[in-house]
Amino acid sequence: MKLLLGDEIGQLKFIEIKKGTDTSNPESEAPVIQKFGELDREKGVLFMLKHEMNVFVARKNGTIECWNVNQEPPILSSLWQLDSSLLETASIVSMKYSNGWLMLALSDGNLLFRHIESSKLRKLQLHGPLSAVELHPRIPGIIAAGGKENDVCLYSCNPTCKSNIDELELWRTENVVKVFQGKNVKNDSLNLRVRVWITGIVFTEDIINVIDGKSEDDESLCFHFATITHYGQLRFYDTKHGRRPVSTFDVSTSPLSHVGLLPSIKLLYFADKRAQISIFDHSKKKVIGRFQGVKGAPSSIHCLGNVVAITGLDRNVRIFDADRKPLANAYIKALPTSIIVINERDAEIIKKEEELEAAKEEEEEIWRNMEQLEDTEDKKPSKRIKL
């Protein structure tokens, strides 16, 4: 398996690790680690995301880089440098990519967009503070945001929710409108107001078998998503059924920090700051299991196919399959802050498959040449014998 890891001292590490590796065992095979970049805490890695063969890296000092991981060694290019004045009173809370646009969200409500091909820049100002921002994974121009005492809102610059919209028309300030404003749950059993602090958002159409946007029978917009909170709640929303969540669950006594989907098994995961990473089944409305062995609060979780990679304060990279079976574990000296699974399969298996494929093609080529030779022999004119 191949991973890309960013750390607090500014380095990026390519890690090749085999299934079954466990560096806590002295007899285990060590992973192969390639390091890139100089040691500089001001350039500490905050976020990474992968699109096709490019990995975008957001650093603490506002530098945004693009890595082409298809090259050997990977090619690094500086993509964008944020104005330092933007980071004097705010911090980067999210980085997302959708339909040609890279988005950076700041805690004060500023959203900055850059079109990768044309280098066009656009800026939106949402109501802050923000601690969670998410773009819809399928529908262009849909964004969800929320924060401390700032309940979740949906904004759109694509009113028809069509997928073939001209991407250069996205994120124009004059076209962005609020399409949903979340409402707090009812007072608790003591008739006290429930505090609001959104710390994560994920759109859930992939795990509950629905389609967001507009349907042929109904012109009204409909979106399905989940939020996590600083106060340990997991909430599900269906915008057709009102502004309040359709269901809410107290799943932890510790602040929740991460939420995401496991599409291969139609489940959702969430993590708290006590190193509990849990799996939630929406159809059963309950937690059905946890990833075991994680010792420190997670700083980053990434899922690719059937593989889940987790890293955090215990300075370990832990890899599981989607059914929570441990696949590998490696200790990393510098505190990891972000992780991406580049390839979920072992390099040796890929090499063997490539060799088998090459041998198969060679054998087929030999048979094709033999058939052509036989056809040529059959077409040769036979000599007549004179009597």
Swiss-Prot record:
Keywords, ordered alphabetically: Nucleus, Ribosome biogenesis, rRNA processing
One GO BP annotation of this record: rRNA processing
PANTHER family membership: NOP SEVEN ASSOCIATED PROTEIN 1, WD REPEAT-CONTAINING PROTEIN 74
Region (Disordered): 368-387
Compartment(s): Nucleus, Nucleolus
Keyword rRNA processing: yes
Family: Belongs to the NSA1 family.
GO cellular component, one term: nucleus
Record has Nucleus as a keyword: yes
Function: Involved in the biogenesis of the 60S ribosomal subunit.
Record note on quaternary structure: Component of the pre-66S ribosomal particle.
SMART domains noted in UniProt: WD40 (SM00320)
Protein name in the entry: Ribosome biogenesis protein nsa1
